């Protein structure tokens, strides 16, 4: 009898690991696959006002320009959830962890950059997507910062990052068929000047640190070959040569 009674009160839990660099849609898919909550519920919750008590989310002041308000703040880590958990509770665990990771020391460093937390998280998310490894993160960061600072003068005001082109999707093939041919992302850094409206994924602590403390370089261009080797350039002409070396241009 005791055994039967103990089962009445047992609630099934599940551990889920979210790798670095997932976007909100991928977080939602993982939650559904693990029986935490449905993908649809998570995506609906991601744009609700339920997270406005978090300072990080409160600071987002352009939510109408974003696809998902919580993008960038769902910290990659391993979490324990209840099966069929409320989606707001589930997402809150990830946001709360992000809040903890962005401690006073890190927030003070961000303040010293003269940028907002959200701008740094946006840069970090692009670094996460565009970099081959940790060392590369700091150089990619320097290139993004150099373009943001000098772009108007030297014609590099557009960040021109492939990872932003189809956001909130990864690739054109992920865009729903009905809008695939005409889809234009508001985050496409080939089209817009400066930073996109917000983060494009949920970056790691390393990417955030790289966004805060870029290497000191005078590069404005980068590319990678299929093996992840990085090529950096100061001028458009050098970049064209690098694209050929990397097998990305004729």
State each model region's role:
Residues 3, 8-36, 109-117:
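Glycine-rich loop/hinge motif
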Residues 15, 42-43, 121:
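Short loop/turn and capping residues at structural boundaries
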Residues 1-11, 87-94:
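Amphipathic N-proximal alpha-helical interface segments
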Residues 29, 40-46:
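Conserved short alpha-helical interface segments
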Residues 25, 35-37, 48-250:
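Bacterial extracytoplasmic/cell-wall-associated proteins, especially those involved in peptidoglycan
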């Amino acid at each position: 009898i005791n055994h039967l009674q103990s089962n009445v009160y047992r609630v099934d839990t599940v551990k889920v690991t979210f790798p670095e660099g997932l976007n909100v849609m991928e977080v939602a898919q993982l939650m559904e696959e693990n029986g935490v909550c449905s993908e649809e519920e998570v995506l609906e919750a991601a744009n609700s006002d339920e997270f406005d008590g978090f300072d990080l989310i409160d600071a987002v002041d352009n939510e109408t320009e974003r696809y998902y308000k919580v993008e960038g703040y769902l910290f990659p880590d391993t979490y324990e959830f209840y099966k069929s958990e409320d989606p707001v509770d589930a997402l809150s665990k990830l946001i709360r962890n992000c809040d903890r990771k962005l401690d006073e020391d890190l927030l003070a460093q961000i303040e010293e950059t003269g940028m907002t937390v959200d701008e740094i998280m946006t840069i970090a998310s692009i670094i996460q997507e565009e970099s081959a490894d940790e060392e590369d993160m700091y150089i990619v960061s320097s290139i993004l910062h150099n373009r943001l600072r000098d772009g108007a003068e030297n014609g590099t005001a557009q960040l021109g990052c492939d990872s932003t082109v189809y956001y909130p999707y990864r690739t054109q093939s992920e865009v729903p068929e009905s809008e695939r041919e005409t889809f234009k992302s508001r985050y496409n850094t080939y089209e817009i000047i400066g930073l996109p409206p917000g983060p494009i994924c949920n970056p790691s602590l390393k990417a955030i640190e790289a966004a805060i403390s870029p290497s000191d370089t005078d590069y404005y261009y980068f590319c990678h070959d299929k093996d992840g080797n990085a090529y950096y350039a100061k001028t458009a002409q050098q970049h064209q040569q690098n694209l050929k070396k990397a097998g990305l241009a004729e």
